Every structure is written in structure tokens, then in C-alpha cells.
């Protein structure tokens, strides 16, 4: 078994297999470092029940204090788009980018932007529902990195900046 470590400023943040680090990041820094994530403030009501946006969701995590504030990590590929009436949450599509094998869809949920990666197209302006299975929620204790990476509100105007590339002139022109 091959173990890896994720470090920040000379300090080990997490040691584990690549799969363990990806699927169960220990803090917001690790979650952001290893890939795109939606990181949302939540409350762990009890073992296997997390709250966000005033709603309760089943999850697989436990070992937290009742009503403990937590960071909830939801990977973009773990979110399913469903009809509004079937959604655990509903939001509005604000951006759609075709990526070849999938779409990157930015959805506004009560002022917070989430990234969803899906093969299903939804047009800008559409009201959609989303469904997240219990194993799609990854619950982390709050840490000094909490809030540094957004309520993946990094998927607002920052997303455009990431996709635009350098603003210099066309290098092919002479």
C-alpha cells in the first residue's frame, strides 16, 4: 500500500492512500488541494445527520458532538441533478461550461455557488433540484482552514478567471 502526505507550510495535514485522502479529507486545505470541492458550513446534529441551509441530510459520518459546527465537503461529481420537486435542495443555474465528457454547471443555492459536474445539460436560468446520496457528504471538523476556500463560492467570478487564461495578445500573430 502506497501512502502519501499532504503538507502545508512544512506541516503534515494528512497521511493516507490517495483514495483515502481524496474521499475523506481531514480539513478544508486538503479538500481544496486535492481537487474541486464544494465546502459548506454545516451542523452535525447527531451521528449520520448533518444540517445545511436549515435542512437535515443523512450522511455516513459520526463521532462529532451534538450540534457541532462542521465543514461539509461535497464533490462536484457526487451531486445529481433532479426535477425540482425531487430535490433535497433547489437552485438556479448561473453558468454552464462544456468540458467534453461532462458539463461544469454553477448553481446558486441561496447566494452560495456550487460546482456540479454532470453529463446532463441544464441551461442557464433553469431552476433545478439536486440530490446527494449519504456517501456524497464528507464531514470535517472545523479547522484554521475553515472558510478560506469559500462556500465554494470560489465558483462565482473566480471560475471565469480560471477559464479565461492569460489576457496577453494572441501569440500566433507576428
Indicate where each model-derived feature is located.
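Compositionally biased, intrinsically disordered low-complexity segments
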Residues: 1-2, 135
